[in-house]
Amino acid sequence: MRAISKLFVFTVLVLGSLQYYCGRYGACPAQIAVISHYTWPCTYAPAVRDKLGKASEWYGANAAPHVSVASGWMQGKVMPHLTKVSQWTEKHVQPRMRQAGADAIVTARVAWNVVQQYQRRHVVPLTGRLLAKCPCLERWAEQAARGWQWLCKHARALATAVQQQYPAFVAHMGGIWEPLHGAYNRIYLDLGRPVQEKTSEDASAAPGGTQYITSTITMTMTSLDELVTVTAEDGLSDVVEASFKDLVADEFSAWQQAIERKADSVLQAFTEEVGEFEMQQHEAVAPKFRALLKHISAKSQEHYAKINQAIRDINSTMELDPATNQTIWFDAHGTQLHQYITRPLMREYFSQANDELANITNHIRAELREVVDSVNGQVDVIRQEHIEVYEEWADVMVSEWSRRMAYIDVVDRDLEAEAERNRNWKRFLKLKKRVIKVRDQLLEHPVKFNQLETFLKEIQSTLRILAQENGEYLYILRSKANLSFQEREKNDRLREQHEQEAREMTLREQLSTELAANGTEVIIDTFEVDLDQLLRSNSTSWSVPPADARAEPASGSPIQQAASEAAQQPSV
């Protein structure tokens, strides 16, 4: 593979050199002219143009519809996510990049000032001493300067030659570039995007109509002895002192800018981290509370269905099981009931519904309180972390800069600069107070959970609405159950009255028959006055099996027991 790569590179270089030679000088042997002709890209321009035209037609008939569908899918499915990513990048990444760029610029300035200071303090005096001890270095510097000038001269000549040959190369490449560019434009237009076309006249413009502006940078090196004179110690010290003052001013300005940027960004960083935490909490708790609301709704419907079925089973029919001689009950559709619906049983159903719904509601509210406490606790942790980081940063910055200013006071012995040093210390104290103030602001900075707070309020509002609706509907069902019980008790009393009248009629007929058989018809009128009392005294001997299997047989008829029970118990 390596040999093939070398062969390919060698072939390309040979062909390129051949094309350059034939285009530059024109006269070349016939065999070389043939090779140059068939290796020149413009030779194949007509064929390429014809093939690209056919390919464009095939593309418009076969590929363009699918490309349009893919483009629509791209716009509908992918672009919204790309927009979100772009917004997130613009909000979070770009500010950090700008901040990093600004910090890098400040760091570079400080480093450059330090390098300049080191160069003026150490390199320049050392160079002067070396030049004084070794005169040959001066001659070497002169030779290096002349070599550099020669190199710059030939580099400028080479650049000029390349610029002169470049228009001819562009003109030769225009023949092959034009069909490729036209086919690309047609494909690009099929995608529904704007295209800026380039005409052949523009592509094959005459070299003479193009103007080039060449800027040449010339560096003139003088010998180092002209820059540094060993005997000029006073002038050098003045330059060093001036540079030192500039360096101090630049460092103080950079430190002040760093303090101000940190003070402005610390609250923003805290707010952004809290916002990200809020988003994570909302995504974590939202499915949980939605599931709890669905659960309480499902439980409410279960209790409603159970109570409604019990209300429908209140009006039931009583029969006696011939096999077990026990009372059984049937609903309106003839289905046997598992148990007889009484007022205590109905009250138990209502109590179960109220208790379970209240427990679920209390559980949801406890979860809400737990979420609020957890969020507040985590916010305190985040705040404390930011405060600790800021305090550490502020302590390092303030202590290091105070040492730096103290060092400047020791090194700088200029009495005229005393006023400037006092102003710097005042500015330092002002910035230190600013740092402390920002720390207090970070400690008391309010936190707003707009999205999470809105969601929790919606959950609480939904709970209140569900509790109100459950209470109202259970009250309606309780009233409906009372009406059903009253209707059943009324029917039981009417049925008991009819049965009592039937028994009285039967007893009268029996007594009349017995007296008539004995020839004592006159006595009937005599006993008519005490007949009702006699029937009441003998009514117990005509009782039917009890309505409730749990009731005592000798306590009267089931209808009488139900009526007495209803009279003694409160409503549902």
Curated annotation (Swiss-Prot):
It is found in: Mitochondrion. Residues 560-572 have a biased composition (Low complexity). Keywords: Coiled coil, Mitochondrion, Ribonucleoprotein, Signal, Sporulation. Residues 351-372, 485-510 form a coiled coil. Residues 1-19 form the signal peptide. Belongs to the SHE10 family. Component of the mitochondria-localized RNase mitochondrial RNA-processing (RNase MRP) composed of one single RNA encoded by the NME1 gene and at least 31 proteins. Absent in the nucleus-localized RNase MRP (NuMRP). Involved in spore wall assembly. May be a component of the mitochondrial RNase MRP (MtMRP), a ribonucleoprotein endoribonuclease involved in the cleaving RNA transcripts to generate primers for DNA replication in mitochondria. This is Outer spore wall assembly protein SHE10. The gene is SHE10.
